[in-house]
Amino acid sequence: YNLIDGVYQLQNTGNDLQTTLDADVCATALEGLGNDAGTVGVYNYKTGEVICMVSTPTYDVEDADDVQKAKDGAYAGVYINRFLSATYTPGSTFKIITAAAGIDTFSDIYEREYVCQGGVEIDGEWVSCMGYHGTQTLTEAFAHSCNAYFSQLAVDVGQQKLDEFAQKAGFNQSFAMDGISAATSFFDISATRD
Protein backbone atom coordinates (compact mmCIF):
# COMPACT_ATOMS: atom_id res chain seq x y z
CA TYR A 1 0.00 0.00 0.00
CA ASN A 2 1.41 3.33 -1.05
CA LEU A 3 -0.69 6.45 -0.45
CA ILE A 4 1.21 8.59 -2.99
CA ASP A 5 1.45 6.13 -5.90
CA GLY A 6 -1.77 4.23 -5.43
CA VAL A 7 -3.75 2.13 -3.06
CA TYR A 8 -2.72 -1.29 -4.33
CA GLN A 9 0.52 -0.68 -6.17
CA LEU A 10 2.60 -3.83 -6.42
CA GLN A 11 5.82 -3.68 -4.48
CA ASN A 12 9.05 -5.31 -5.62
CA THR A 13 9.48 -7.36 -2.47
CA GLY A 14 7.10 -9.87 -1.00
CA ASN A 15 6.02 -10.36 2.55
CA ASP A 16 5.99 -13.39 4.78
CA LEU A 17 2.69 -14.99 5.62
CA GLN A 18 2.13 -17.46 8.41
CA THR A 19 -1.09 -19.42 8.74
CA THR A 20 -2.37 -21.15 11.84
CA LEU A 21 -4.32 -23.74 9.84
CA ASP A 22 -3.15 -27.30 10.38
CA ALA A 23 -3.32 -29.20 7.07
CA ASP A 24 -3.53 -32.60 8.77
CA VAL A 25 -6.43 -31.53 10.99
CA CYS A 26 -8.23 -29.99 7.99
CA ALA A 27 -7.71 -33.13 5.88
CA THR A 28 -9.04 -35.35 8.68
CA ALA A 29 -12.07 -33.07 9.08
CA LEU A 30 -12.76 -33.08 5.33
CA GLU A 31 -12.52 -36.86 5.24
CA GLY A 32 -14.84 -37.14 8.24
CA LEU A 33 -17.50 -34.98 6.60
CA GLY A 34 -17.45 -37.19 3.50
CA ASN A 35 -20.35 -36.31 1.21
CA ASP A 36 -22.34 -34.54 3.93
CA ALA A 37 -22.89 -30.79 3.87
CA GLY A 38 -21.45 -29.26 7.00
CA THR A 39 -18.47 -27.68 8.66
CA VAL A 40 -15.72 -28.46 11.11
CA GLY A 41 -13.95 -25.65 12.88
CA VAL A 42 -11.26 -25.63 15.52
CA TYR A 43 -10.60 -22.23 17.04
CA ASN A 44 -8.19 -21.36 19.86
CA TYR A 45 -10.27 -18.97 21.94
CA LYS A 46 -7.20 -17.79 23.87
CA THR A 47 -5.13 -16.70 20.88
CA GLY A 48 -7.73 -16.29 18.13
CA GLU A 49 -5.91 -18.79 15.94
CA VAL A 50 -8.00 -20.84 13.54
CA ILE A 51 -6.59 -24.38 13.45
CA CYS A 52 -9.22 -25.88 11.14
CA MET A 53 -11.91 -24.37 8.93
CA VAL A 54 -13.46 -26.89 6.56
CA SER A 55 -16.77 -26.47 4.78
CA THR A 56 -18.58 -28.95 2.52
CA PRO A 57 -19.66 -29.40 -0.18
CA THR A 58 -16.46 -28.13 -1.68
CA TYR A 59 -14.96 -27.83 -5.15
CA ASP A 60 -11.64 -28.05 -6.95
CA VAL A 61 -10.53 -24.55 -8.02
CA GLU A 62 -8.40 -26.07 -10.77
CA ASP A 63 -11.31 -28.01 -12.30
CA ALA A 64 -13.33 -25.80 -14.65
CA ASP A 65 -16.18 -28.33 -14.72
CA ASP A 66 -16.63 -27.95 -10.97
CA VAL A 67 -16.76 -24.16 -11.26
CA GLN A 68 -19.29 -24.36 -14.12
CA LYS A 69 -21.48 -26.79 -12.13
CA ALA A 70 -21.46 -24.30 -9.27
CA LYS A 71 -22.67 -21.55 -11.62
CA ASP A 72 -25.43 -23.81 -12.93
CA GLY A 73 -26.71 -24.57 -9.43
CA ALA A 74 -25.67 -28.23 -9.46
CA TYR A 75 -23.32 -27.46 -6.59
CA ALA A 76 -25.67 -25.63 -4.28
CA GLY A 77 -23.73 -23.94 -1.53
CA VAL A 78 -20.14 -24.71 -2.53
CA TYR A 79 -19.13 -21.09 -2.15
CA ILE A 80 -20.62 -20.80 1.32
CA ASN A 81 -18.15 -20.90 4.18
CA ARG A 82 -20.44 -22.76 6.55
CA PHE A 83 -18.07 -22.17 9.47
CA LEU A 84 -18.66 -18.41 9.27
CA SER A 85 -21.94 -18.03 7.38
CA ALA A 86 -24.26 -20.87 8.36
CA THR A 87 -26.26 -21.47 11.51
CA TYR A 88 -26.95 -24.86 13.04
CA THR A 89 -29.02 -26.25 15.87
CA PRO A 90 -26.62 -26.32 18.81
CA GLY A 91 -27.37 -29.94 19.72
CA SER A 92 -25.53 -31.39 22.68
CA THR A 93 -23.46 -28.27 23.23
CA PHE A 94 -26.64 -26.63 24.55
CA LYS A 95 -26.65 -29.16 27.40
CA ILE A 96 -23.93 -27.04 28.99
CA ILE A 97 -26.28 -24.05 29.05
CA THR A 98 -29.18 -26.16 30.34
CA ALA A 99 -26.95 -27.60 33.07
CA ALA A 100 -25.73 -24.13 34.09
CA ALA A 101 -29.32 -22.87 34.28
CA GLY A 102 -30.25 -25.95 36.33
CA ILE A 103 -27.37 -25.41 38.74
CA ASP A 104 -28.45 -21.80 39.19
CA THR A 105 -32.12 -22.73 39.66
CA PHE A 106 -32.13 -25.83 41.87
CA SER A 107 -30.20 -26.24 45.12
CA ASP A 108 -30.64 -30.03 44.83
CA ILE A 109 -29.52 -30.23 41.20
CA TYR A 110 -26.87 -32.90 41.82
CA GLU A 111 -29.41 -35.19 43.48
CA ARG A 112 -32.24 -34.43 41.03
CA GLU A 113 -33.00 -37.49 38.92
CA TYR A 114 -34.87 -38.02 35.67
CA VAL A 115 -35.61 -41.24 33.81
CA CYS A 116 -34.42 -42.01 30.29
CA GLN A 117 -36.24 -44.79 28.43
CA GLY A 118 -34.59 -44.18 25.10
CA GLY A 119 -36.22 -40.78 25.11
CA VAL A 120 -39.03 -38.90 26.78
CA GLU A 121 -42.34 -37.39 25.77
CA ILE A 122 -42.50 -33.62 26.22
CA ASP A 123 -45.82 -31.92 25.44
CA GLY A 124 -46.88 -34.78 23.16
CA GLU A 125 -43.59 -34.83 21.23
CA TRP A 126 -41.08 -37.66 21.58
CA VAL A 127 -37.51 -36.54 22.23
CA SER A 128 -35.29 -39.49 21.39
CA CYS A 129 -32.02 -40.40 23.04
CA MET A 130 -29.18 -42.57 21.75
CA GLY A 131 -29.35 -44.82 24.80
CA TYR A 132 -31.62 -46.23 27.50
CA HIS A 133 -29.96 -44.72 30.55
CA GLY A 134 -32.64 -45.32 33.17
CA THR A 135 -32.72 -43.13 36.27
CA GLN A 136 -29.74 -40.80 36.44
CA THR A 137 -28.35 -37.66 38.05
CA LEU A 138 -27.00 -34.57 36.30
CA THR A 139 -23.45 -35.91 36.41
CA GLU A 140 -24.47 -39.24 34.89
CA ALA A 141 -26.70 -37.59 32.28
CA PHE A 142 -23.89 -35.25 31.28
CA ALA A 143 -21.51 -38.19 30.87
CA HIS A 144 -24.12 -39.98 28.71
CA SER A 145 -25.14 -36.80 26.85
CA CYS A 146 -28.70 -37.88 27.63
CA ASN A 147 -31.35 -36.02 25.63
CA ALA A 148 -34.17 -37.28 27.87
CA TYR A 149 -32.60 -35.92 31.07
CA PHE A 150 -31.76 -32.52 29.63
CA SER A 151 -35.17 -32.15 27.97
CA GLN A 152 -36.89 -32.76 31.30
CA LEU A 153 -34.47 -30.45 33.10
CA ALA A 154 -35.09 -27.71 30.50
CA VAL A 155 -38.84 -27.94 31.12
CA ASP A 156 -38.34 -27.64 34.88
CA VAL A 157 -35.84 -24.77 34.54
CA GLY A 158 -38.31 -22.85 32.39
CA GLN A 159 -38.22 -20.66 29.35
CA GLN A 160 -37.13 -17.44 31.05
CA LYS A 161 -34.10 -18.94 32.81
CA LEU A 162 -32.98 -20.85 29.68
CA ASP A 163 -33.27 -17.69 27.61
CA GLU A 164 -31.24 -15.76 30.20
CA PHE A 165 -28.44 -18.33 30.18
CA ALA A 166 -28.46 -18.61 26.37
CA GLN A 167 -28.02 -14.83 26.13
CA LYS A 168 -25.13 -14.98 28.64
CA ALA A 169 -23.50 -17.68 26.49
CA GLY A 170 -23.60 -15.43 23.43
CA PHE A 171 -26.68 -16.65 21.57
CA ASN A 172 -28.40 -14.07 19.32
CA GLN A 173 -25.03 -12.39 18.83
CA SER A 174 -22.34 -12.45 16.18
CA PHE A 175 -18.60 -12.49 16.59
CA ALA A 176 -15.77 -11.52 14.29
CA MET A 177 -12.58 -13.35 13.39
CA ASP A 178 -9.96 -11.08 11.87
CA GLY A 179 -12.64 -8.61 10.88
CA ILE A 180 -14.91 -11.21 9.25
CA SER A 181 -18.27 -11.39 10.98
CA ALA A 182 -19.76 -14.80 11.57
CA ALA A 183 -23.46 -15.47 11.14
CA THR A 184 -25.52 -14.30 14.09
CA SER A 185 -26.59 -17.18 16.26
CA PHE A 186 -30.30 -17.51 16.84
CA PHE A 187 -32.09 -18.76 19.91
CA ASP A 188 -35.84 -18.36 20.32
CA ILE A 189 -37.95 -20.39 22.70
CA SER A 190 -40.86 -17.96 22.79
CA ALA A 191 -43.20 -20.60 21.33
CA THR A 192 -42.38 -23.14 24.05
CA ARG A 193 -44.38 -23.63 27.18
CA ASP A 194 -43.42 -21.99 30.46
Where are the predicted features?
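Conserved, well-ordered alpha-helix/loop/beta-strand core segments that scaffold catalytic motifs
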Residues: 2-39, 46
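Beta-lactam-recognizing serine transpeptidase/beta-lactamase-like catalytic domain environment
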Residues: 3-8, 46-92, 97-194
